[in-house]
C-alpha cells in the first residue's frame, strides 16, 4: 500500500506554527480584525462540524478536512489569511502500487477536476490554479464528491466548516469567500496578524554531551519524579536513552527516559546548572496554553537550539502532534506545532498548523 496524495491550488506558506514561551490564550470565538488595522495574533482553535474538522492557527491560516469512506482517505481545504490568499485543495487515499495511475479525478456533483500525478512520493497532483477556488466552493455547496471511481468523500459538515473559516478570516460577503461569497472586494479582508518573534540563543560547544552513553547526574537521580521514571524503565532498553546538551556556559539540558510503547518513547526534560545541579523541569508549552516537561519521540538539535517531538496517534504516523521549541537563553519557546486529531491517513506534510512564529 502507498498513500496517494492529490493537491490543488496554490501551495501554502510553510506550515510551521507554534507559540513563544507562553502559548496564546483568549476567547475562541474572537471576531476577525478589521481590514487596515494592525492585527494581533489570534488564538489557535480546532472545531468539529459533523464529519468535518476545521483548524485555524495563531496566524489565522485555516484548514478544513473531511474523510473518505472506510477511513482510508481525506480531503483538505487550506487557505492563508489576507485578501491575496487563494485556497489549496488536497486529497489523498491509500492504494495498492499496482492500482496507482498517472492521473486521478476529483468529482463534485458531476463536475470533474482532473489532476495529473507528479513523480514524487507520496504521489501528488494539482488542479490548475484557476480552479482551486471553484473546487473549494463546490465542496462547500456540494452533495456528492469522490476521488477516482471508488473513494467517496463525506461532505457532511463541509459547508459549516468552510463558513467558519470565512468568518474567522473576515471573508464573508467578499469575492474571496469559500462558502458565502459576495460583492465586497478582496481588499476588505483583514491583513494577516503579526506572528510572535522567537530568537534562538547563541550556539554552544557540545563536547561531552549528546544522546549516546550519557550518565544521569546524581542531582537528577535524586528527584522523586526522576526516580519514578527510572523505576518504570529499569528493565527496559529505553533506560539507556538519556540525552544531554549544553545550553550555555552555566546551563545544561537533560532528558530522562520515562516510558516506551510500540511506536512512542517518552522523556521528561530538565534544565540544570553545571553537572546537573539545581534541576528544574523544562516548561514546554503547547498551542492550547498547556505546558509540561514531557515529550514523545523527542530529541534536541544543538545547531538549532531546539527540542522537537512527534507524538504519534498510531504507528503509521498519520495523526498526532509535531512540535518544536527553541531555547532563547531564558526558556524554551514553542515555535512550531502541527496537530492532526483524526487518523484518516493524512501525512504530516498535510497536517494543520496550530502555531507559528517568525
Predicted region positions:
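Bacterial N-terminal signal peptides
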Residues: 5-13
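A generic "folded-domain core" signal
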Residues: 15-232, 244, 265
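Short beta-strand segments that buttress and anchor functional surface loops
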Residues: 65-66, 254-259, 308-314
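Short, solvent-exposed coil/turn segments at beta-strand boundaries
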Residues: 83-84, 108-110, 141-142, 247-252, ...
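Signature of short aromatic-glycine-proline-rich micro-motifs recurring in repeat-based ectodomains
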Residues: 230-243, 296-299
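Exposed beta-strand-loop-beta-strand "reactive/processing" segments of non-cytosolic proteins
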Residues: 242-262, 267
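Structural motif
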Residues: 262-270, 317-323
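Short aromatic loop motif centered on NTY/YTY
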Residues: 280-358
Amino acid at each position: 500500500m502507498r498513500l496517494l496524495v492529490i493537491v490543488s491550488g496554490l501551495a501554502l506558506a510553510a506550515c510551521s506554527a507554534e507559540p513563544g514561551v507562553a502559548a496564546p490564550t483568549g476567547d475562541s470565538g474572537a471576531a476577525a480584525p478589521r481590514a487596515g488595522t494592525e492585527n494581533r495574533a489570534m488564538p489557535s482553535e480546532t472545531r468539529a462540524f459533523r464529519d468535518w474538522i476545521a483548524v485555524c492557527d495563531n496566524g489565522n491560516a485555516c484548514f478544513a478536512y473531511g474523510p473518505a469512506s472506510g477511513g482510508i482517505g481525506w480531503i483538505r481545504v487550506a487557505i492563508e489569511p489576507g485578501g491575496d490568499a487563494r485556497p489549496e485543495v488536497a486529497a489523498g487515499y491509500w492504494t495498492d502500487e499496482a492500482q496507482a495511475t498517472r492521473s486521478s479525478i476529483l468529482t463534485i456533483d458531476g463536475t470533474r477536476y482532473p489532476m495529473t500525478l507528479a513523480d514524487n512520493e507520496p504521489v501528488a497532483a494539482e488542479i490548475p490554479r484557476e480552479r482551486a477556488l471553484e473546487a473549494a466552493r463546490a465542496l462547500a455547496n456540494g452533495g456528492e464528491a469522490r476521488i477516482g471511481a471508488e473513494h467517496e468523500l463525506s461532505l457532511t459538515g463541509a459547508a459549516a466548516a468552510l463558513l467558519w473559516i470565512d468568518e474567522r478570516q473576515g471573508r464573508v460577503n467578499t469575492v474571496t469567500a469559500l462558502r458565502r461569497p459576495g460583492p465586497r472586494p478582496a481588499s476588505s479582508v483583514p491583513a494577516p496578524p503579526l506572528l510572535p518573534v522567537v530568537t534562538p540563543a547563541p550556539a554552544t560547544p557540545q563536547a561531552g554531551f549528546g544522546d549516546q552513553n550519557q550518565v544521569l547526574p546524581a542531582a537528577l537521580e535524586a528527584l522523586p519524579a526522576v526516580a519514578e521514571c527510572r523505576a518504570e524503565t529499569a528493565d527496559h532498553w529505553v533506560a539507556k536513552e538519556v540525552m544531554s546538551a549544553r545550553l550555555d556556559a552555566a546551563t545544561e539540558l537533560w532528558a530522562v527516559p520515562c516510558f516506551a510503547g510500540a511506536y512512542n518513547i517518552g522523556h521528561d526534560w530538565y534544565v540544570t546548572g553545571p553537572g546537573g545541579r539545581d534541576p528544574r523541569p523544562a516548561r514546554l508549552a503547547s498551542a492550547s496554553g498547556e505546558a509540561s516537561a514531557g515529550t514523545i519521540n523527542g530529541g534536541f538539535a544543538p545547531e538549532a537550539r531546539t527540542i522537537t517531538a512527534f507524538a504519534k496517534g498510531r504507528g503509521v504516523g498519520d495523526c498526532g502532534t509535531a512540535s518544536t521549541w527553541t531555547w532563547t537563553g531564558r526558556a524554551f519557546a514553542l515555535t512550531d506545532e502541527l496537530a492532526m486529531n483524526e487518523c484518516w491517513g493524512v501525512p504530516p506534510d498535510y497536517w494543520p498548523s496550530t502555531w507559528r512564529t517568525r
